[in-house]
Amino acid sequence: MALRKPTDDENALLDLMIARADAFTPSAADRTGLSVETMNDGGMGSLRLFPPGTRGKSRVFGRRVSDWAFDDLDGVQVTVALVVDANDRLYELELWKSDFGRLLRLPELPAK
C-alpha cells in the first residue's frame, strides 16, 4: 500500500486516541509529519503510522496506549486501539469491527 497523509477524519480519530492515551504524548514533529498506510485488514480501516524518519526502518510493537469503541453505521461495534513502537513512536491505529465486516464510516468527531 502507498504512503499518504491522514484524512481529516483519520486525524480527528488520532487526536482523540492521543488525548485518551495513558502516559504517552507524541512529539509535535511526529504528529505533524505523520504519514499513514492502509493495512490489509479486510477493509476495517486500520492504519500503519509512520512518523518522520521511520519509513523503511525496522520497528516492533511497543505497547497499546489507548482504547475506544464506537458503533458503525450498521450498529456493529468497532474497537479502536492506538499502538506505539518500542521507541514510543506512533506505530498503528488498529480498528476491529466485531463482525469482521468492512468499516462503513469513521465516527464523526470534531477536528482540532
Each model region followed by its residue ranges:
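Short, compact, well-ordered microdomains
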Residues: D71-K112
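N-terminal domain-onset segments
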Residues: M1-D67, L104-K112
